[in-house]
Amino acid sequence: MATATGVAEERLLAALAYLQCAVGCAVFARNRQTNSVYGRHALPSHRLRVPARAAWVVQELPSLALPLYQYASESAPRLRSAPNCILLAMFLVHYGHRCLIYPFLMRGGKPMPLLACTMAIMFCTCNGYLQSRYLSHCAVYADDWVTDPRFLIGFGLWLTGMLINIHSDHILRNLRKPGDTGYKIPRGGLFEYVTAANYFGEIMEWCGYALASWSVQGAAFAFFTFCFLSGRAKEHHEWYLRKFEEYPKFRKIIIPFLF
């Protein structure tokens, strides 16, 4: 039987999920009006910057630490269930790679504006709490949920998306040879079809996670990811078209053959 505290927390986590959707809509609208504040689109006025490798580690850390804390906690009743453990592990694997592997594979990388890094820390803290707390304390699944078609298809999409994301990052890292400083057109993999193959992979990841978790919290995360990364992808696409006359005109922005 749910306690009053448990019911209150479930309502809080649902409210946070809907808030995440609202913020996603605001981010999507803002990205249509102004450029991003980091990477190749950062303005010279952003003088306070953090080294790229350090920024990635610090900003992604909350989404790694919070699930680990829940796994270590003795007061996480839902993690006695296999579906909950697997779903939280999916979240943890992504951020383990993002926090502990990806930054140390980077070659150079422009320093990130402090504002962008701070915003990323806030998001990863809020979302890390939302996803890990929901799966460890609130989400209820049948023991055979891992054989449900929604879970199996979702897990397949998550795994495929993560592999696409990692492979696309590998292609981007290897665009420049030692001593090169300029930008080049990405070739190979899904970059033959879209400008932002790495973003497409990440969106697929979290859509798969949302399907496998079959929750408002998972869906909110996938929705926010699409709102944020689709705007970034559109900026990249327009930038490549301006910079390279030979840029393939048939490439879509982020979804092969569609958008």
Curated annotation (Swiss-Prot):
**Protein localization:** Microsome membrane; Endoplasmic reticulum membrane
Keyword Oxidoreductase: yes or no? yes
* PROSITE patterns recorded: S5A_REDUCTASE
Q: Which InterPro entries match?
A: 3-oxo-5-alpha-steroid_4-DH, 3-oxo-5_a-steroid_4-DH_C, SRD5A/TECR
Gene Ontology terms: biological process: androgen biosynthetic process; androgen catabolic process; bone development; cell differentiation; cellular response to cAMP; cellular response to dexamethasone stimulus; cellular response to epinephrine stimulus; cellular response to estradiol stimulus
Gene3D superfamilies cross-referenced by the UniProt entry:
1.20.120.1630
Annotated protein name in UniProt:
3-oxo-5-alpha-steroid 4-dehydrogenase 1
Organism, as annotated: Homo sapiens (Human)
State which gene encodes it.
SRD5A1
